[in-house]
Regions:
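Structural recognition of the conserved hydrophobic beta-strand(s) that form the central parallel beta-sheet
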Residues: 79-83, 119-126
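Conserved P-loop NTPase "ATPase switch" module shared by AAA+ and STAND
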Residues: 74-98
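Substrate-engagement module of ASCE P-loop NTPases
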Residues: 65-71, 100-119
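Single conserved hydrophobic/aromatic residue that forms the stacking wall/gate
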Residues: 1-7, 11-12
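Conserved helicase/translocase motor-coupling segment
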Residues: 211-273
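Accessory beta->alpha helical hairpin/"wing" motif in late/C-terminal subdomains of nucleic-acid enzymes
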Residues: 284-296
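A short, conserved structural fragment
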Residues: 275-286
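Amphipathic alpha-helical segments of the small helical/lid subdomains adjacent to P-loop NTPase cores
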Residues: 133-136, 144-203
Length: 296
């Protein structure tokens, strides 16, 4: 399930978007309505979730219910994948209904707590999950971020993958321009390319071999949190941004344990947010010359 669509103010007032997301999820499991392993009471709740007429309580408990019913159906613990868990929380924080959204998300995340039907869950988001209060009471998290080394090569395309893609597409002559435009990240020992940018540019090259690289990723992100920082930026922040835009380097302490309700409590949180969400990256050791901007 992806919670990306859940996050408009309408969602908080009448749960329209959440109801739609859950309905679409349950439509993929219509077999439960015909199963002799699901009792009539649960089938009625499933029908209501599909139709969008379920109570708020049943909607919040829908992930817990679905994992339990799938376990009953197949006799195997369920793997739960939740994509972009924090998009609704970020949007709510930007629009003034953070606490209400936390209540909604807490209900959904009950599926992670004391759930005998759950094998394990994989959750993705911009901010580290351990401290966000929607996960209160959930134990045994293993959190991997871009500052760790275990999964660095999986955050995007590494150089060997890009080389093979360009070879397969017969556009090896574009390697240098693609590196300059889309090789924007350095995680551990890996240079990492943005897959969305690379694939969109290759698609455009198939249509027009003379196409120039452009930034495709910038149109897919919600920049409300970043803009809110910039709106209140003082001269210190402005100066550092100018240094970065000029290709320079600044030194800032990165705090991985951010929560959205405290994002604006310090300037350092801005740099942490920019780094954790991919707007900034750390320099390669061979590119770092030790020269720092004043005040860093």
């Amino acid at each position: 399930i992806t919670t990306r669509l859940v996050g408009s103010e309408m969602c908080i007032r009448d749960s329209d978007m959440l109801t739609l997301v859950i309905s679409e999820l349950y439509k993929k499991h219509l077999y439960l309505l015909d199963s002799d392993k699901v009792d009539s009471f649960d089938k009625e709740i499933v029908k209501q979730l599909i139709q969008g007429t379920a109570s708020a309580k049943d909607t919040k408990g829908s992930l817990m219910l679905l994992t339990r019913l799938m376990y009953q159906q197949y006799g195997k613990p369920v793997i739960l994948l939740i994509d972009e868990y924090d998009v609704p929380v970020a949007k709510a924080n930007s629009n003034g209904y953070y606490e209400e959204m936390l209540d909604v998300m807490k209900g959904l995340m009950q599926a992670l707590k004391d759930n005998q039907a759950l094998c394990f869950a994989v959750i993705t988001g911009c901010l580290k999950i351990a401290k966000e209060s929607i996960f209160t009471g959930t134990n045994n998290f293993i959190s991997d971020t871009i500052t760790d080394s275990r999964l660095n090569e999986y955050f995007g395309f590494v150089q060997s993958e890009v080389d093979q893609i360009l070879k397969d597409a017969d556009v090896l002559d574009k390697a240098e321009s693609i590196r300059e435009w889309y090789d924007g990240y350095h995680f551990g020992d890996f240079d990492v390319y943005c897959p969305w940018d690379v694939m969109n540019y290759l698609l455009e090259l198939q249509r027009n071999p003379k196409a120039k690289p452009v930034s495709y990723w910038k149109n897919t992100s919600d920049n409300a949190v970043i803009r809110s920082f910039i709106d209140y930026a003082g001269s210190n922040i402005t100066g550092k941004l100018e240094t970065l835009l000029a290709g320079g380097t600044i030194v800032q302490r990165v705090d991985e344990n951010l929560t959205y309700d405290y994002l604006h409590s310090s300037e350092n949180n801005l740099w942490s947010m920019l780094y954790l969400t991919g707007y900034l990256t750390k320099p390669r050791e061979e590119d770092y010359n030790g020269k720092l901007a004043d005040g860093t």
